[in-house]
Regions:
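Active-site Gly/Thr loop motif
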Residues: 172-189, 222-285
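Active-site-proximal alpha-helical segments within enzyme catalytic domains
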Residues: 92-95, 141-148, 187-211, 244, ...
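Short, charged, amphipathic alpha-helices and their helix-cap/turn boundaries
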Residues: 21-29, 71, 105-131, 155-177
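Structured C-terminal helix/loop/strand segments within mature extracytoplasmic catalytic/sensor domains
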Residues: 263-317
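Active-site helix/loop module of the DD-peptidase/beta-lactamase fold
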Residues: 41, 57-100, 126, 147-188, ...
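A short, well-structured edge-of-sheet supersecondary motif
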Residues: 2-41, 170, 249, 273-277, ...
Length: 317
């Protein structure tokens, strides 16, 4: 029944769709040449992965959510007198740091990761934004958070941080942070992964295998309840969503009248759509790589099939 409906849906590109319910049973649908084992560019689906990796370092004692960039990065150029001097790791992971201006180096593979982070700081140094007051969806925040993690862990680059996560968890075995390059990976959108790998990650997160209870409660806080939502791609759906640490608190409404952490997701600009529905207790991903700016198309496909998926959740056997 789900197969039939998915086959009838109009899509601009082939996709794979996988969901896992509480008993571990999975339903998978693969359209055309797409497979759950197809490697796709992540776009913003990497945001949740990056945030969880960093939150594990907090849990392991290497970092604190209250840490400021200048506590970890010797070359951090923001003046102590600047309003931006109060930004901390929690602000960075929730995109409320005030770093709204995104320099070109974030997308330049030949640039040094650390020098680009300093370029990010300098590009925003005079903006007078108070950290925590404004939500602005951009790649800047996670680059700074990532460098804090690299320094706190005492390793040369994000690749060592990611490899340690892989070794500790067994997840994302063949995935990489390699866009625009391995030397200057964009933590907010620079992975390659397969749908199967991402679904395994969501499953482990849901089961409490990646974060302890205290870390999970930190992860699930609505970090933008009082922030002004200055730039949000969710507006393309005509909806108001809030933000946590590297993911969205969804709300299918023109105002945020939903309970936070009911349904969380980290969709990407190519239309891939990973989610954890906490009210119905299942995880899933619509894996695809359409044109840039097709975020809404992946979400729309998932919404079309959701009633059938929710019926499947209730089925025995």
């Amino acid at each position: 029944d789900m197969n039939t409906q998915l086959a009838q849906l109009v899509s601009d590109t082939d996709f794979s769709f996988g969901v896992e319910r509480d008993d571990g049973r999975r339903y998978v649908y693969q359209r055309g040449s797409s497979r759950m084992q197809t490697s796709y560019e992540s776009a913003s689906t990497s945001k949740l992965v990056s945030a969880v990796i960093i939150l594990r370092l907090v849990e392991q004692g290497y970092l604190k959510l209250e840490d400021k960039p200048q506590d970890r990065i010797a070359t951090w150029p923001i003046a102590a007198s600047s309003p931006l001097a109060t930004m901390n790791l929690a602000n960075l992971l929730s995109f409320t740091s005030g770093l709204t201006e995104e320099p070109l180096c974030v997308n330049a593979g030949f640039i040094n990761f650390e020098s680009c982070v300093n370029t990010i700081a300098n590009a925003n140094a005079s903006n007078q934004i108070t950290p925590g007051s404004e939500f602005y969806y951009a790649s800047t925040h996670l680059q700074v958070a990532g460098l804090m993690a690299i320094k706190a862990r005492g390793v040369p680059s994000w690749q060592e941080v990611f490899n340690e996560f892989k070794q500790q968890t067994g997840l994302f075995k063949n995935a990489s942070y390699d866009l625009p390059s391995l030397n200057n990976p964009r933590l907010a959108g620079g992975m390659h992964w397969t749908g199967e790998e991402y679904l395994d990650f969501l499953s482990a997160l849901k089961k409490g295998r990646l974060l302890n209870a205290a870390s999970m409660s930190q992860l699930l806080v609505d970090r933008t309840a009082t922030a002004k939502l200055v730039y949000s791609p969710a507006a393309a759906l005509g909806e108001v969503w809030h933000y946590g640490l590297g993911y969205w608190h969804e709300c299918q409404s023109t105002s945020f009248n939903c309970a936070p952490a009911t349904r969380i997701s980290s969709p990407g600009a190519y239309g891939a759509y990973p989610f954890w529905d906490r009210s119905k207790s299942y995880v899933g991903i619509l894996a695809r790589q359409g044109e840039l700016g097709t975020f809404t198309k992946g979400a729309t496909l998932e919404r079309a099939i959701r009633p059938k998926v929710e019926a499947w959740l209730a089925c025995a056997g």
